UniProtKB/Swiss-Prot annotation:
Fe cation 3 binds at residues 431, 434, 464, 467. Fe cation 2 binds at residues 83, 166, 227. It comes from the Bacteria. This is Anaerobic nitric oxide reductase flavorubredoxin. The gene is norV. Pathway: Nitrogen metabolism; nitric oxide reduction. The keyword Translocase does not apply. InterPro entries: Anaer_NO_rdtase_flvorubredoxin, Flavodoxin/NO_synth, Flavoprotein-like_sf, Metallo-B-lactamas, ODP_dom, RibonucZ/Hydroxyglut_hydro, Rubredoxin-like_dom, Rubredoxin-O_OxRdtase. SMART domains: Lactamase_B. NCBIfam families: PRK05452.1 (NF003954). Residues 30-210 are annotated as: Zinc metallo-hydrolase. Its main location: cytoplasm.
Length: 482
């Protein structure tokens, strides 16, 4: 099956609805992907890229239904990775002498994958062109390390289509091909996820390369990517986003992620987030447990954030393995213009938080003070965590924060509980597992416990909203039990 892109250009690629892992297991393709190949039929017939190797036979079979393979005059390989050039071996078994146009580095990559040095390679560099008849040309632009050394883009004159390789793409599968046809929220989420997890390390190269391409003063009516949609409506919108993302991008957002053995570090994360929100209710705060969250979503949020707090329990004097792995990935992604702080709980001996702080600093983050707790944090320790969050909010604020935005402290809230006790509602009760506090003056509306309900009148089937345990794990709040 083919889809008309424009005039004599057709999409002859492959949709992959089922793929969930890309680059090994490093990128979760939660919405599938597509491998975009394009057939140009002008005075010369040109094939731009192929598809992933696992679809080789299907690709060649579908291509044969579109064109006699012997009629293909040129093959353009913009990128030698297997999801782009994977079907070459199958295709070349039918047309072994067809010229392949690619960069010098691509020959090494193609031979490394396919082991056919006898193929008819023709190397190109930036500014080279290929006449394809009917007054049209293909112009080549090398884009090394966006994101492989062999990468290039191909521009078609006349139709003003830029075949952009991996740039401006998304791992996003849809039966509809064009950007104006698909769900816009999904599309831009996947664009940002793709940039954050794949292209961020090369941000320093993105702006000068885009500037170089724009310097050719060539009109761009469409951008035909290697994955995801073809940009036909306002195609330069994605170019503008790339320029924005490449410029040390950050939003007014803070990301916390952690791993925990006994929920102690989770309690710290929750309290830190509360403190941040007390001081700066306008900042977006996102919390992730790495054991239960999509790694690429975490990294996308780090990319969007002005700062990140990373938490870990101590195990064998070092950080938890999932945290160590994620910090290693952040090191490779080379995030810039971001701050960081480490936190975590330990038992008889620590070590993980200091190690984590060093690793975050080595990864290029501007470090703030770290925070440690021993064993399960009690009321006082959780207040220290909230205070840490308040300080982080002030230090990381993008603009001065008004004093009026500060909420009551935990001590003030405890005073409110004491006032409730004097009003004959009885004491506040604290969950001994997660430290959540039941205040009789407030009740718990989500479980139909009305404000003003003393603990003795709370139904026996009441569950702690934080840890879902019953009334038997609650004790009188420590400040009232003294």
């Amino acid at each position: 099956m083919s889809i008309l892109v424009k005039n004599n250009i057709h999409w002859v690629g492959q949709r992959d609805w089922e793929v969930r892992d890309f680059h090994g297991t490093e990128y979760k393709t939660l919405r599938g992907s597509s491998y975009n190949s394009y057939l140009i039929r002008e005075g010369k017939n040109v094939l731009i890229d192929t598809v992933d190797h696992k679809f080789s036979r299907e690709f060649v079979q579908n291509l044969r239904s579109e064109i006699d393979l012997d009629a293909i005059d040129y093959i353009i390989i913009n990128h030698a990775e297997e999801d782009h050039a994977g079907a070459l071996t199958e295709l070349m078994s039918y047309i072994p002498n067809t010229p392949i146009y690619c960069t010098t580095n691509a020959i090494d990559s193609i031979n490394g994958h396919h082991h056919h040095p006898e193929w008819n390679f023709h190397t190109v560099k930036t500014g080279d062109s290929l006449d394809i008849g009917n007054g049209k040309q293909l112009i080549f632009v090398e884009t090394p390390m966006l994101h492989w050394p062999d990468s290039m883009m191909t521009y078609m004159t006349g139709d003003a289509v830029l075949f952009s390789n991996d740039a401006f793409g998304q791992h996003y599968c849809d039966e509809r091909l064009f950007n104006d046809e698909v769900d816009q929220t999904e599309l831009f989420e996947q664009c940002q996820r793709y940039y954050a997890n794949i292209l961020t390390p090369f941000s320093r190269l993105v702006t000068p390369k885009i500037t170089e391409i724009l310097g050719f003063n060539l009109p761009v009516d469409m951008i035909a990517t290697s994955h995801g949609v073809v940009w036909r409506e306002n195609p330069t919108q994605i170019v503008e986003l790339y320029l924005k993302w490449a410029a040390d991008y950050q939003e007014d957002r803070i990301t916390l992620f952690y791993d925990t053995m006994s929920n102690n570090t989770r309690m710290m994360a929750d309290a830190i987030a509360q403190g941040i929100n007390e001081v700066d209710p306008n900042v977006a705060v996102k919390i992730f447990n790495v054991a239960r969250s999509d790694k690429n979503e975490i990294l996308t949020n780090v990319f969007r954030s002005k700062g990140v707090l990373v938490g870990t329990s101590t195990m064998n004097n070092v950080m938890m393995p999932k945290i160590a792995g994620l910090v290693e990935e952040m090191t490779g992604l080379r995030f810039r213009n971001k701050r960081a702080s480490a936190f975590g709980s330990h038992g008889w001996s620590g070590g993980a938080v200091d190690r984590l702080s060093t690793r975050l600093q080595d990864a290029g983050f501007e470090m703030s003070m770290s925070l440690k707790a021993k064993w399960r944090p009690d009321v006082d320790a959780l207040e220290i965590c909230r205070q840490h969050g308040r300080e982080i909010a002030r230090q990381w604020a993008l603009a001065p924060l008004p004093e009026a935005s500060v909420k009551p402290t935990q001590q003030q809230e405890n005073c409110a509980c004491a006032a409730a006790a004097t009003a004959d509602l009885g004491p506040c009760m604290q969950c001994s597992v997660c430290q959540w506090v039941y205040d009789p003056a407030l009740g718990e509306p989500l479980q139909d416990v009305a404000p003003g309900t003393p603990w003795s009148d709370v139904p026996d089937n009441f569950l702690c909203p934080e840890c879902s345990l019953g009334k038997d794990v609650f004790d009188v709040l420590a400040t009232e039990a003294k």
